[in-house]
Regions:
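S-adenosylmethionine
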Residues: 1-124
């Protein structure tokens, strides 16, 4: 059973034992993303508007990034970074499955991002 989680805009809490959402075809199709409420909160609290330029510095495995990307509605850009190359690969997979096209996935030190994108982002 899924219950509406009233703290966030489009999120539900799964409290059942018989269904395994991570094995559902809709999950593999990118129609929903599984994560803890604590991971949902940052992206839901940041006032993202379509067209914004957004940086997610610690983006893997992709929960915040997929929510931020969805809030951009295909406009603007999201730079999703994780300093771990292996985690960034998993992040890229999740972004691709979710179908968000305006995302640049990086595996870079934050200082390097600051150097190349000085005063570029609207939201971090």
């Amino acid at each position: 059973r899924f219950n509406r989680y009233h703290g966030l805009r489009m999120d539900f809490i799964y409290d059942g034992e018989h269904v395994q959402p991570a094995k559902h075809p809709y999950y593999f199709a990118g129609l929903f993303y599984l994560q803890e409420p604590s991971a949902m909160t940052p992206a839901n609290r940041l006032p993202i508007e379509p067209g914004d330029k957004v940086l997610d510095v610690c983006a893997a495995p992709g929960g915040k990034a997929t929510e931020l990307g969805a809030k951009l509605c295909g406009e603007g850009v999201l730079v999703a970074n994780d300093i771990s190359n292996s985690r960034a690969k998993g992040l890229l997979k999740n972004i691709e499955v979710f179908g968000i096209g305006n995302v640049l996935v990086l595996s870079e030190e934050p200082g390097k991002i600051e150097e190349y994108f000085t005063e570029y982002f609207d939201k971090i």
